[in-house]
Amino acid sequence: MAPNLRKSHPLLKMINNSLIDLPTPSNISAWWNFGSLLGICLATQILTGLLLAMHYTADTTLAFSSVAHTCRNVQYGWLIRNLHANGASFFFICVYLHIGRGLYYGSYLYKETWNTGILLLLTLMATAFVGYVLPWGQMSFWGATVITNLFSAIPYIGQTIVEWAWGGFSVDNPTLTRFFALHFLLPFAIAGLTLIHLTFLHESGSNNPLGIVSNCDKIPFHPYFSLKDALGFMLMFLPLTTLALFSPNLLGDPENFTPANPLVTPPHIKPEWYFLFAYAILRSIPNKLGGVLALAASVLILFLSPLLHKSKQRTMTFRPLSQLLFWTLVANLFILTWVGSQPVEHPFIIIGQLASLTYFTILLILFPITSALENKMLNY
């Protein structure tokens, strides 16, 4: 009998073990679809980004015009740009849902997979930030100025780091050029990290909604989950194309239709919606260094999740108190996102401060306490 090429060829063997014959828990729900959705998001962003880069000029005098030229004169340039800009939003929606799934079902107990995932998130945030600067509109310019300027809060070396990052004494041509270079490079770093992420995942196998060992009941990835993923792709591309075709500027800032002008500050500088929760946490602390530390902590706190897991059960499936806390955290993140988009005025300041405090309290204090309480309740 001839050997099966799929199982004997060095390259096909790897693909086979990762995507075809991979033993998968039979009960994983739609919450396990987001990994593959993130993969397809990355592929789409790299493809549309490559096509956009072919028509883009990384120069302060030409950047804004080159983007306008792409939208007006390049065949389907408007569509490629709209898919790329809104694709970023869908990327972040998927990433936040993916992290939420990980927190809810205790997937963070696969420490290596979880830690590489956080590195992926940080790289993704950096990529999105430098990419937002490229169209060189007002919000691009001022967003770049405000966020890079935060590094000056680092004692002693801060100002030097900022001027080094800028390539001068303000955000200017060198900044735009290096941001373009980074925006081109980082997605490939994300792709590389994704492979590491998957390597660690396949070392342990997938978690499942019950959080129990599922070795006795696994099914091949193909055709069951390959088909399920294909359905997921369709359900994501439908709203993405709808948004890109019918309301492409819904999530953007109108300020970015004005070319960058260092002499005119926009009335309200704010990042894209997917960074607003962190921006709200940054603004909630009146001290610059304190704000920067809180901003960093808002994402880096995820590294502590495996250490703060005190429950005897892995998932929250059978833990109603932790569930209540989890959904309170989700609601709190929505409040932070909303506050981040509002001006720094009376009700919003205190709401932002309370929401920021709640965010850290739930993650650092209430989750472990509730877990311990639920452990006690198991004895009765």
Curated annotation (Swiss-Prot):
Heme b b562 binds at H84, H183. The gene is MT-CYB. It comes from Oceanites oceanicus (Wilson's storm petrel). Its cofactor is heme b. It is a multi-pass membrane protein. It is found in: Mitochondrion inner membrane. Heme b b566 binds at H98, H197. GO terms for biological process: mitochondrial electron transport, ubiquinol to cytochrome c. It comes from the Eukaryota. Its main location: mitochondrion. The chain crosses the membrane at residues 34-54, 78-99, 114-134, 179-199, 227-247, 289-309, 321-341, 348-368. This is Cytochrome b. GO terms for molecular function: metal ion binding; ubiquinol-cytochrome-c reductase activity. InterPro entries: Cyt_b/b6_C, Cyt_b/b6_C_sf, Cyt_b/b6_N, Cytb/b6-like_sf, Cytochrome_b, Cytochrome_b_C_euk/bac, Cytochrome_b_N_euk/bac, Di-haem_cyt_TM. Heme 1 (or BL or b562) is low-potential and absorbs at about 562 nm, and heme 2 (or BH or b566) is high-potential and absorbs at about 566 nm. One of its GO terms (cellular component) is mitochondrial inner membrane. Component of the ubiquinol-cytochrome c reductase complex (complex III or cytochrome b-c1 complex) that is part of the mitochondrial respiratory chain. The b-c1 complex mediates electron transfer from ubiquinol to cytochrome c. Contributes to the generation of a proton gradient across the mitochondrial membrane that is then used for ATP synthesis. Binds 2 heme b groups non-covalently. PANTHER family: CYTOCHROME B (PTHR19271:SF16). Belongs to the cytochrome b family. Keywords: Electron transport, Heme, Iron, Membrane, Metal-binding, Mitochondrion, Mitochondrion inner membrane, Respiratory chain, Transmembrane, Transmembrane helix, Transport, Ubiquinone. The cytochrome bc1 complex contains 11 subunits: 3 respiratory subunits (MT-CYB, CYC1 and UQCRFS1), 2 core proteins (UQCRC1 and UQCRC2) and 6 low-molecular weight proteins (UQCRH/QCR6, UQCRB/QCR7, UQCRQ/QCR8, UQCR10/QCR9, UQCR11/QCR10 and a cleavage product of UQCRFS1). This cytochrome bc1 complex then forms a dimer. SUPFAM superfamilies: a domain/subunit of cytochrome bc1 complex (Ubiquinol-cytochrome c reductase), Transmembrane di-heme cytochromes. A ubiquinone binds at H202.
